[in-house]
């Protein structure tokens, strides 16, 4: 992990596809996609139910920042998913602000527009398939506490992409991200907090790496398997995390203490750009405790660990649109192996002796 005094200015987006285990049959959300111009997409969402819904926008296609709003596949007999090149988040599960929500009244329809070429390399051109599926977390109308989740699945859209135009969109965003200004953002109390979190992260990861091969009950609780291949895979991830968190002068990632890519709204604690190995701690991060002994709590150390799993050099995990212990338990074993909060909560549970 390297600290950086250089800042960038805006890049790409995060992913939030959800667990297949979620039941989508009775959802009141009707979501449809439409391509309006080359790689520009309009998403329409209608509340077909009889009750108003207070939807949590962060990390969804209603988010103003660049997050993974659709899944993109190269068309063919065996569709190949196009790698997502945007931001991955860790979101607070408490003390959320009203601005993070959108009330969708019964019978109401709203739209969101975005360009998929910002965070997907579509420069080869040709036919691509698009769809979005997942779940919106929601709160009761008089609250900002998450009360549950509403699943959704959109239609599939096939579109012909002009590769030259799509490539220019992507290059323009990359060029913007490379425009740097000098700033000493990881200094003072923020620098101290970040260095402490990295040290605690390394300690948590080392303990978790050992438990992966020596604590089958805990491994089964979080990863739903005790096979030697699962244990070895999980141990490898934690060993990589321990290496990344173990140094502030070397490693594959760069740590920032200010919102260099403008994605710290809506309850975001921290975010990562896996394609550039940039990690950002948001203002909310510095309001967390350094390391909590409460079961499944969020703190600075586990937020760092969560974001580390998103790095391609570590695992390249997804969030599947969900956070917390209950969501971890709802996933399949295969999904747990690629889910950031599963690794986070396994390590935290060992420390908190859950």
Swiss-Prot record:
CDD domains noted in UniProt: M35_deuterolysin_like
Endpoints of the signal sequence: 1-19
UniProt cross-references to SUPFAM superfamilies, sorted A to Z: Metalloproteases ('zincins'), catalytic domain
Cofactor binding, per record: Binds 1 zinc ion per subunit.
Glycosylation sites per record: 214
Cofactor(s) the protein requires to work: Zn(2+)
Active site, UniProt feature: 307
Catalytic activity: Preferential cleavage of bonds with hydrophobic residues in P1'. Also 3-Asn-|-Gln-4 and 8-Gly-|-Ser-9 bonds in insulin B chain
Positions of the propeptide removed during maturation: 20-182
Enzyme class label: hydrolase
Name under which the protein is recorded: Neutral protease 2 homolog SNOG_02177
Organism: Phaeosphaeria nodorum (strain SN15 / ATCC MYA-4574 / FGSC 10173) (Glume blotch fungus)
